[in-house]
Each structure stands twice: as structure tokens, then as C-alpha cells.
């Protein structure tokens, strides 16, 4: 039975121009739950406030937790939270295809948001392969070790248990498997984290690896911070420092163990993310030679590509490599479909995802973000597909060129919004990401985190009133938590993601007709399909979270 839509006009305020005068929403027929819903002319928008979680400590512990979302002045968010239906979503652990208790991240979050189902992540798949002995039976890995016999095997990647880009246990498993396969020389080039983990947790991870590597005879020969080795914004001067350390043995020569050397760097004021290149063996000489095998054990692609290109591309022009060893280059997962290098774990193919369905229906969609999150609203949101769907437009706004985003917490949010406002009326679906809460949250600088949150709130105050004037609808959510916990219990900065829940707020002229159920990130795509008046495919196992009242 059809239900007729009634209109609720909230007293929504634009912080720049004052109260918004909105025309009434035309009455439309709306068929609830499992049936078609006729959408109005305005766009449907998914607004992802990246890294904006809900700290269970609330206002009482906002200073103790360094909760930038509650320390900030957010009058527009407060109004949305008060006047529109909302609920909470789980964005971590098994609810997003990660191991139980594992914090979420942007790649995982956007995969689940776009797929409309729980997407079992590479971390989970690789852990399972190691536990069940499948890793050592992998054909690509066996061929890799065969190539490494008589040469050096170089294991490069992020050494931490952050689980966002890698897990150090995977490196240990690869080293053990290589030893069992007859590989004699195993060099580990370790990237320290400090972003998805504690800023000074790296020494402990290295200490564990030093012990675990004794079985395989592997040795840590390089340590360098991810700031240099995992840049993704074409800051090639950073990548060159990592290349020079790994390939040419250039850096600070250390006589102590890697863990002890890193501890000393802490005393000198350095932290893991910004760890300068440290060299422990074969200093100031070419260490990667023709015929060697280089295995990049990060499972997430975006921050592994620049260094990979330096190894792979003949016409590479990011920096002067000085030498280009002809190596057998292998990656744990597929980093890019254009790369010729083999990979150990093939990507999981996802069908009937949100972008595909919207495109097949002949609707126009816009994906927009600044550089830091552009891959997430495109490649990851589309299930690992690089090519846009038909009628899917993409707009990239360059992120500011600063060393760390606490120096410019506004990032490029205002430029993003200018672009959205100019294009909004031309699309049926808009996927928008605000990078600030996550990227500034990673710095651990609370004052900057507060400014980042306030920046996003000001942007929301510009975009939502315009959307409502167009009779559009918005879902406001996040991909994971971060900036709601920027201080640890001991008072030290917290730079990692959290496992906290995230907001789910429905903003529309008809919002009073609905309540929002709690759910998981996989429920967002089915809800958007409902708002677009499109049927939900069987492969989308999430649920529409809007329930009529």
C-alpha cells in the first residue's frame, strides 16, 4: 500500500547567511521497504566525514580523550543531530570483514560503503591462508622463491600490527616460507608506522621481528619511516630517500640492533612515521642487484605504488634512480592493473555494487574529494575497479603541499565545497568525502584536529541548505573513527584509527517520516538505492536503514 509523503520543514540555519527559506517539498508517492520509491528531482548525496567517530566517553571525557569532535564548535552538526533522524554504524572488526576487534580504515570503509555487503578484507584472507597452510602452496610464491635461490630476497613493507596497510606477521610468515624453500639470503627493509599505531611503537615491533627472524636467518638491513617510503601524493623527494636507503644503502649507519637504534632516535625527538633512513648492513653500496627478488608485503595498494613504480618502470621520471636493478618484483596483492608484476593474492571481484547499479539505471553520479581521499571515493568505493562506470564523473581537488596537515587543517575542504555547489544540480548521486578529520587526526595535534572538525562543519553549513533547496537528500556518515580520540590514557598523542561507532544521519525535507536503525557500513548502499528509487540486488546483503514512522 502506498504511503503519501508529508513534509517537515526544519529551521535549518546557514551559518553564513542566516535562516534558510525553503520551498515545500512536493507531495510524492513513496513505497516503503522492498518496493520501488519514486525519487524527486534533487540529488541524493552521501557525505563521508572521514575519521569522524563517536567516542563513548562523551562530553565528560572530551579533554581526557582529546575528542576533537566535541572540543570543537560545531553548531551545524549539533543542529543536524538534534533535528534529523540518526543512528550509529559499526565500522570495524568483523562488521567490515576484518578480524574481530581490528580497527577500521578508509580503504575498508569505502569498500563496504560502495559494495552494500560485508567485504572480507585482504588482512583476513591472508591471515586465514597462513593459518591453514595455503600460503606456502601458493603458485606465485613458490615461483618467487625459486627465482630467489642464489640471489637475495628483499622483503619490503610496513612493520606494525596496524592492519591498515600490512601486518608484520605476514613478513615473518614469508621469511619462514622462503627459508623452508631454500632461500639463503633474506633482507628485510622495514618501514616504521606511527600513524596507524603509536608514534613510538616501532621499536617494540622491530624487537619482535628481530627475535622471529632468527628462525629464517633473515636480517633487518634498513629502517625508514613511512613518511618517506609510503608517500602517495607524488612527493618524489620523499620516495627517493627510501629508494636510496633500500637500493643504495644510504642513510645513517647504525652499529646497534634496529630496535635499539630506533629507541635512540626517539630520544633525539624522532617518531616512527618520520624515522630517517637507518642502515644496518652493506652501507653505502648497491644492495639490490640484477636477479634479486623484491617482495612488497603491504596488502594495501595506494601507498605502495610510488616505490613500486621506481622498481618497475623503464621510463620512470619521479627522480634519478642512479641505478635500476633488473629484479623479479612481486607484490602481496595486486597494486595496479597496469603493472606487469605478479601478485600472490588476487583481488576479490565484486558485482552489483552501488556505482554499477546507478550507472546501469542511466543516472549520473559524481565522485569528489581532495587528493588524500580521491582513490577512496573512486577506486575503493567501486570495489577495486579503476575505470569509472558510464555517467560517473570524477573531480579531484589537490590537497595542500604541506609536510603534515596540522599545519593546514582546513586542507582543501572549502575548494571541494565550491566545486560541489557548482555541480550539485547536475547529478542524481554525489559521493563526497571530507578528508580533514582523518588526515589531521593522524597528526595527533588536538588543536589542529579541532580546527579540522570546525572546517568540515562550516562546509556542511554551506552544502546542506543548498541541497535541501533542490529537494535533495543526504546521508551523513563516516568510514571509521579517528579524531574523536587524539589523546591516549597516558597523555601521549593518539594518531591511529579507532574502533568506535560512526554517525548515520538522514537529512531531507521528508526526514520526519523516518527513523534510522543502527547498522553497519554495508547498510549505506541499500539505503541510498532506496532513496534513488532503485531495486536492491540480491548480492547486496545490507539493509535499508530508513524505517517509516
Give names to the regions the model predicted.
Residues 7, 18, 25-549:
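Feature captures the catalytic ectodomains and active-site-proximal regions of enzymes
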Residues 3, 12:
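Cationic, low-complexity basic patches in intrinsically disordered or flexible, solvent-exposed regions
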